């Protein structure tokens, strides 16, 4: 199970999940990825279950990258405890996921789009957030201004 080796503080506030992911929202390592569509907490157990499902389907061919890490402790009080007497002890770890965040990436010579899509579909069932399959050959965020300028220059050269 994934968890930090050490943290500065044992307990954290629950926090708010608003906005979209500004970091970790592009494919960096593989050709295919699983991208979050809404926000939520993904536990270390859910990450491990998803990883196992994908690894089992691809039969250890190719490579899988986990792009999220559970670094937030979630505390719980013992059952039937009276109110007060402080905050509970950390029980498990979660990764805070915002829309647009890449959760898993997959790549390799043996991995085709069909294999990756099916493996990611199996992983989707293990996760509490809505996700979608994306591949690196399709531009995720639309055309950037730089790409539009390059395309415009190339079409002008063809016309001359």
Swiss-Prot record:
GO CC list: ribonucleoprotein complex; ribosome
- Annotated InterPro entries: Ribosomal_uL16, Ribosomal_uL16_bact-type, Ribosomal_uL16_CS, Ribosomal_uL16_dom, Ribosomal_uL16_sf
Intrachain disulfide bonds:
none
In alphabetical order, the GO MF annotations are:
rRNA binding; structural constituent of ribosome; tRNA binding
Extract the PROSITE patterns matched here: RIBOSOMAL_L16_1 (PS00586), RIBOSOMAL_L16_2 (PS00701)
List keywords of the entry alphabetically. Answer: Ribonucleoprotein, Ribosomal protein, RNA-binding, rRNA-binding, tRNA-binding
Give a GO biological-process term. Answer: translation
| The protein's role, per its UniProt record | Binds 23S rRNA and is also seen to make contacts with the A and possibly P site tRNAs.
| Protein family membership | Belongs to the universal ribosomal protein uL16 family.
Q: What is the name of this protein? A: Large ribosomal subunit protein uL16
């Amino acid at each position: 199970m994934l968890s930090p080796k050490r943290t500065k503080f044992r307990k954290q506030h629950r926090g708010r999940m608003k906005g979209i992911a500004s970091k970790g929202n592009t494919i960096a390592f593989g050709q295919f990825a699983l991208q979050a569509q809404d926000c939520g907490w993904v536990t270390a157990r859910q990450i491990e279950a998803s990883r196992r499902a994908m690894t089992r389907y691809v039969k250890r061919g190719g490579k899988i990258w986990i792009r999220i890490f559970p670094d937030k402790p979630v505390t719980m009080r013992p059952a039937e405890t009276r109110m007060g007497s402080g905050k509970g002890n950390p029980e498990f770890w979660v990764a805070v996921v915002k829309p647009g965040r890449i959760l898993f990436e997959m790549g390799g010579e043996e991995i085709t789009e069909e294999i990756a899509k099916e493996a990611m579909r199996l992983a989707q069932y293990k996760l509490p957030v809505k996700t979608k399959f994306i591949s690196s050959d399709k531009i995720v965020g639309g055309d950037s201004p730089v790409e539009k300028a390059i395309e415009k220059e190339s079409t002008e050269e063809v016309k001359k």
